[in-house]
């Protein structure tokens, strides 16, 4: 019995040396979060009513609205910068359409080591490149592309500036809302 105990004591001390290694594990969950800072944008044209018979409703300054798009993305695909944010609209008022441009200057100025690989505005939406405003439809359109693991910061002034403009495209389909508002939905989807 004594011999067994002595042998065990020597085998335990034989595992130690002047260099020791330890295995560690790191677990990070993949995540994809997108947020538009203003949850609701209202295009109020009640002050744009014509004052002279025979004059049309002409959309005034309220036809232009802005907000910011923020996101956080942790890729699950080995670091390929293939994340995207797409945009679509449903239930837009008949007789109208909405256009969108995006400005990514602020996001492009962020430190890559701190914020990660932020995406670029797709060229057809890029306000900084002189793009024409894109008409939003019910079909997803890529707005931000080449997103790596990154985050934009949270709130107004962070991320990407979104610039909406409302347009009349068929006057015959317009109708008065009598104080209520027609509701449409703009959907942003982040994916990799």
Language-model-derived ranges and their functions:
Residues 8-14:
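Sec/Tat signal peptide C-region and signal peptidase I cleavage site
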Residues 14-133, 140-192:
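N-terminal small/polar-rich segments of proteins
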Residues 1-7:
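Bacterial N-terminal signal peptides
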């Amino acid at each position: 019995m004594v011999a067994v105990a002595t042998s065990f004591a020597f085998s335990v001390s034989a595992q130690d040396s002047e260099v020791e290694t330890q295995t560690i594990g790191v677990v990070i969950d993949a995540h994809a979060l997108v947020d538009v800072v203003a949850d609701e944008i209202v295009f109020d044209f009640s002050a744009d009513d014509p004052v002279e018979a025979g004059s049309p409703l002409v959309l005034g300054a309220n036809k232009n609205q802005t907000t910011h798009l923020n996101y956080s993305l942790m890729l699950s695909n080995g670091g390929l910068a293939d994340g995207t944010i797409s945009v679509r609209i449903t239930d837009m008022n008949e007789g109208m359409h909405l256009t969108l441009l995006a400005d990514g200057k602020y996001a492009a100025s962020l430190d890559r080591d701190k914020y990660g690989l932020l995406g670029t505005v797709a060229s057809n939406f890029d306000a900084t490149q002189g793009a024409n405003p894109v008409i939003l439809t019910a079909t997803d359109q890529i707005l931000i592309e080449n997103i790596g693991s990154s985050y934009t910061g949270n709130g107004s002034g962070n991320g990407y500036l979104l610039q909406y403009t409302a347009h009349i495209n068929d006057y015959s389909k317009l109708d008065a809302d009598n104080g209520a508002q027609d509701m449409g939905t703009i959907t942003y989807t982040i994916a990799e």
